[in-house]
Curated annotation (Swiss-Prot):
UniProt family annotation: Belongs to the HipA Ser/Thr kinase family.
The protein's Enzyme Commission number: 2.-.-.-
Active site annotation, chain numbering: D302 (proton acceptor)
This protein's name: Putative kinase Y4mE
NCBIfam families the UniProt entry points to: couple_hipA
């Protein structure tokens, strides 16, 4: 078996080569042209530009972090007929459209030239077509194996990237940059579509930077449509990819250890990362601070290192909009413990003034600032809950369930205020 190669493309240029040798070991090396151009960026904060190739241990957190996780990875691999542990084989089949600006393609392929979306003639989906996708995702995550589709997204939840044209969802043509993500409900937990839509819109209502979401349904089947923040459409209607990486990728942490309790990033690690990488660290530190407080208020205990990202746009690296915000405490079968401790506290019941003092030190900010952010965010959340419910009540299939979520958030907001 010879060395297998995937060219890593970024905006029409080869960044380098992702390889797998005859022993199954993966590696990555930047191309000479990419290294010689002082205007090019590294793929990741964990993969600085250098001539020496990167080993499996060094490059796997980034490349493995482009793929689905946990059961989604297993079922995807089964659908493709490859080993779930084989990152190269999975990216060979799925790497045509991933999170960020990259495309991973075989040596004999090049990216298609971008053009206005309608000119590329993606396949439109009627309600029956959407239902077919919803039915297929449990056994074929990301529609893995469907001819012409090479799509990947990280995460343990079922989802598939699509394009949106004039408000209508469509399957992309081969190599086309997707613009939105369709997320079906999580089968084990009722109401996750309504839950995530409400929490994401609540975050937007109080001024947090979040990915826009829209709850929809097809033949009575609910799903969520999330706008991709790592894409932009120019004046001619051409969709461009923007590079991004999650905090685990940036810190060189494999997706299997994304939780802080397993060696994954802590909030201290995340704040230090932003100060090191961000072009506007003061702004982004406050953005992460607010996100931590908001997640405690709404009961999103699953905010681990892969649920925060860095976006590399033309203004420099910055913290990406928030995504995957869900009130996980609404489901008794899920652990109420926060994925990343806040000042050594893992639940709202444990949170106290000493916890906030420790958290302020981890964030590298003063306790008075943390208290002001808590007060402002709690007050804004309490005021916005009813307004968000009223403004979006017609979008939710299960209004009783979303009212329950809203009541829970309002109650938690009061407890967070008392904890300071």
């Amino acid at each position: 078996m010879t060395v297998r190669v995937l060219n890593v493309w970024w905006d029409g240029r080869i960044v380098g080569q992702f390889t797998q040798d005859r022993h199954g070991d993966i590696g990555f090396a930047y191309s000479e042209a990419w290294l010689d151009d002082e205007n090019t960026l590294p793929l990741s904060a964990s993969l600085p530009k250098r001539a020496e190739p990167f080993s499996r241990r060094e490059c796997r957190p980034f490349f493995g972090g482009l793929l689905p996780e946990e059961s989604q990875r297993l079922v995807t691999a089964q659908a493709l007929g490859v080993s779930p542990a084989n990152d190269f084989a999975l990216l060979d089949r799925l790497g045509g459209d991933v999170a960020g600006a990259l495309q991973l393609l075989p040596e004999d392929q090049e990216p298609i030239e971008a053009g206005p979306l309608p000119d590329q003639q993606p396949t439109p989906l009627d309600e029956a077509g959407i239902v077919r996708i919803l039915d297929a995702l449990p056994t074929r995550p990301l529609l893995a194996g469907q001819e012409g589709l090479r799509l990947s997204l990280a995460g343990a939840q079922s989802k598939v990237p699509l394009v949106l044209i004039d408000g209508e969802l469509a399957l992309p043509v081969s190599g086309q940059a997707t613009t939105h993500i369709l997320k079906p409900p999580i089968a084990r937990f009722p109401g996750t579509t309504e839950n995530e839509a409400f929490v994401m819109r609540l975050a937007a209502a109080i001024g947090l930077d979040v990915a826009p979401v829209e709850p929809r349904s097809a033949n009575g089947r609910p799903f969520l449509v999330v706008e991709r923040y790592d894409r932009y459409r120019d004046a001619d209607g051409v969709v461009h990819r923007i590079h991004q990486e999650d905090f685990c990728q940036a810190l060189g942490v494999p997706p299997e250890t994304k939780y802080a309790s397993e060696g994954g990033p802590t909030f201290k690690d995340c704040f230090e990362l932003l100060r090191r990488v961000s072009a506007r660290p003061a702004t982004d530190v406050l953005k992460l601070l607010d996100a931590a407080i908001f997640n405690l208020v709404v009961g999103n205990a699953d905010a681990h290192g892969k649920n925060f990202s860095i976006l590399y746009d033309d203004q420099g690296p910055k913290m990406a909009p928030l995504y995957d915000l869900l009130s996980t405490v609404a489901y008794p079968d899920l652990s109420p413990k926060m994925a990343m401790r806040i000042g050594k506290r893992v639940t709202l019941a444990e949170m106290d003034a000493d916890g906030w003092q420790t958290f302020a030190k981890e964030a590298g900010v003063g306790l008075p600032l943390v208290r002001r952010r808590i007060t402002n965010l709690v007050d804004s959340t309490a005021e916005a809950v009813a307004r968000v419910l009223e403004d979006t009540s017609d979008l939710y299939i299960d209004s009783a369930r979303i009212n329950h979520f809203a009541d829970s958030v309002a109650g938690r907001a009061k407890l967070v205020r008392l904890s300071i």
